[in-house]
Amino acid sequence: ALPEADIHVFDNNSSDDTAAVARAAGATVTHVALRGKGNVVRRMFADVDADVYVMTDGDATYDAGAAPRLVERLVHDNLDMVVGSRVDDGQDAHTYRAGHRFGNRMLTGAVAQLFGGGLTDMLSGYRVFSRRYAKSFPALSRGFETETELTVHALELRMPYAEEATAYSTRPEGSVSKLSTYRDGWRILKTICKLFVSERPLQFFSIIGALLALMSVALVVPVFMTYVQTGLVPRLPTAVLATGAMLAAMLSFVCGVIMQAITLGRREAKRLSYLAIPSVRERVSRGLAVGPR
């Protein structure tokens, strides 16, 4: 599909002959000892130096013929990420299982609510990236939750991105998916929560503070009414608990303000790192781009 591209295959401790077959076909094979897709993505962006990155899983489920179209969209529209959203023919229920489809829709919706964006397939493993995206991506995840991190990185830095529908096929006979619907879904959900805390700390701690403040008010109102009527505070432990809850609410809000300032500074640093690299269109106009890899 991309005859001018350099092909890199990252072998994540596979037990078959994938690495040997890829090497015989002319691909550059890199062994990644640390298990997990996130570890592979981290190594890929660190080791490969390219102007355009096409990332796909090695299970033959994604349409390789769509790669030129995705690359063209990236270059023509001067984007930093193009996601190949999965569309199956519906003839085989195992192609895109209902549980995976529902989980993807739920998690994609959660990210859209928390971080914005209009993606419909956040968990797609078929993506095209610009050089400045790849070199500014911190890649902290270890497993399948890396797709969530890839998406949120683009949304947080307000990078231009797009989504293109691509065919999604059944895995080859004898091939078994390593994705666990519940285990990996739970890990992805935890990643979304962690990213919400780290990227939206003021909102997170404000929610916690508001809940604590409401609890404090609910506890103190009856105590205060009794005091107004009798001049006594018969439920002293309740009054102490209400005071502690209000102090915790104020402390939570202050923590949110401090963490938000730290997050903005970190985001500015990533943005400057991102802007230090020319865009795809600029590299093409200067004759720097040498084709996707």
Give the predicted meaning of each segment:
Residues 4-8, 19-47:
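Conserved donor nucleotide-binding strand/loop of the catalytic core
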Residues 12, 16:
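Acidic ATP/Mg2+-coordinating residue in the GHKL
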Residues 26, 77-78, 158:
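Glycine-centered short loops/turns at secondary-structure junctions
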Residues 32-47, 52-55, 64-144, 148, ...:
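Acceptor/aglycone-binding surface of glycosyltransferases and processive sugar-polymer synthases
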Residues 60-62:
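Acidic metal-phosphate-binding loop of nucleotide-sugar-dependent transferases
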Residues 140-293:
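Hydrophobic helical membrane-anchoring modules
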